[in-house]
Amino acid sequence: MAGSKACALFVVASLFGSGLAAAAEQPSAAQMMDDLMYGRGPVGGPFTLTDQTGKQRSDTDFRGKLMIVYFGYTYCPDVCPTDLMAITQALDALGPAAGEVQPVFITIDPERDTKVLADYVSAFHHSLVGLTGSLDEIRKVANSYKAFYVKVQDERSGDYSIDHAGVIYLMGRNGEYLGFMPPQTNPNRLTEVLRKSLAK
């Protein structure tokens, strides 16, 4: 998607500007963003996770619709709620056509998020599905989407935050990767991209 590459470079620069290093079990932020921008290898793939109601859901459940996939966490103070609200506004702007789009929020913090996931997703679009799983399951799905994230421990408080790329993924009706949009994409731009994708 035109314009996404330049913004994605800012995402990578921001991550490294914070002095972050990628977790050992995943590629670096720069490598994953390069793979996304330049189409190096597949993006997405099969998964089976648990939704906010406790039901197992797989990627095949959403076939026949466009799928918006967003990796984030409920304790995220700014980027996640901003992006999820933009997705909500874009879907509202689509009107009845929004029924052909399935938004999916995959938590990258299942240790804290699983119990509060239902309440969290209810604050956004009514069709938003929240997905959780074990740490290994989430990492596997994130890696298949080339979604970078790393836990950052605060030694003083004993708490942690999670740094992540906040990329908005768009998947086709058959689960194929269509492209990505950077964090804080304008809702009007999201609506435009969705309309064009639905028309194909």
Give the predicted meaning of each segment.
Residues M1-G3:
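N-terminal secretory signal peptides that target proteins for export/translocation
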Residues G44-G45, M67, A165-V167:
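Short loop/turn microsegments at loop-to-beta-strand junctions
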Residues G19-A23:
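Sec/Tat signal peptide C-region and signal peptidase I cleavage site
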Residues D59-P81, I87:
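Short active-site neighborhood of thiol/selenol oxidoreductases, capturing the structured segment around
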Residues C7-S18:
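Bacterial N-terminal signal peptides
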Residues T82-V141:
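Structural microenvironment flanking redox-active thiols in thiol-disulfide oxidoreductases
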Residues E25-T60:
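N-terminal "domain-start" segment that seeds a small globular fold
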Residues E137-V193:
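Thiol/disulfide oxidoreductase modules built on the thioredoxin-like
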